[in-house]
Amino acid sequence: MDDHTIDSESTEKQYNVAMVDRAMKILDYMLKSESTAGISQLAKYLDLPKANVFRIISTLEKWGMVERDPLFENEYRLGKALIVYGQKAKKDINLLSVAKPVLKEIAQDIGETANIGVLHENQIVILHSEQGEASILVSILPPTCSLHNSSLGKVFLANMPDSDIKGYFTQTTFERQTANTITSYDEFSKQKDQIITDGYSLEKEEWEYGLSCIAVPIKDSTGHLLAALSVSGPSSRMELKNYDTIIARLKQGADEIINRLSTER
């Protein structure tokens, strides 16, 4: 998100990790090459000792990013894991392109910030936010949110198997950011059934005092949870605008996104 962007040449150098940079150069070389590549060839390209290149290649092979050519044992090519990553990226890009106009409409209708988020490694990544007319006075949500104290997160948490929910709460100790913050499985279990049954999650000053958020799931025709859609704003304004009205508009938006995704396939 723009307010979290750090833009400077010195910062780029500071956070550049040499080993990761070299690994990416190997992948880029293989992408542009018309044939497979061997250790000697890559070592010459990177101007590195063969032993260093072999260690990088071995790690990439472990993660499926590269694989040995079945006809030439000491030659490598891009691995099939990249197909999975590419398909996931394509799906998120398609989702985002379809969701953006819907988010804009919701933000205009409600007058608050509309957000869409996806699950990534036990946290929510905010793919995009649109601000409504009144939402300019509200701090923008961070680029990631926790599962236990955000409406977007609680949608995903409620749809997980019970064993995974218990594991989430037992593996980490959560601090209360406000008096309303959920920090245990027992606390969340009181909300889980409501979230599933009613099809929405309400977060009322659990992340930050004065801020409330409502989210609904975006599920495909098979019931798979793709993302979550939310509206966030000052608690006082959200209550005045009527939660039921916001929930209905969010559910309508979720249906619109799914319908548009279906027609694009």
Enumerate the predicted regions with their spans.
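Amphipathic alpha-helical effector-binding/dimerization core
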Residues: F72, R77-Q171
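Cysteine/selenocysteine-centered motifs that mediate thiol-based redox chemistry or coordinate metal-sulfur cofactors
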Residues: D164-G167, T172-T173, A254-R265
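Extended hydrophobic
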Residues: N180-G253
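Short, solvent-exposed recognition segments
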Residues: D3, V138-W207
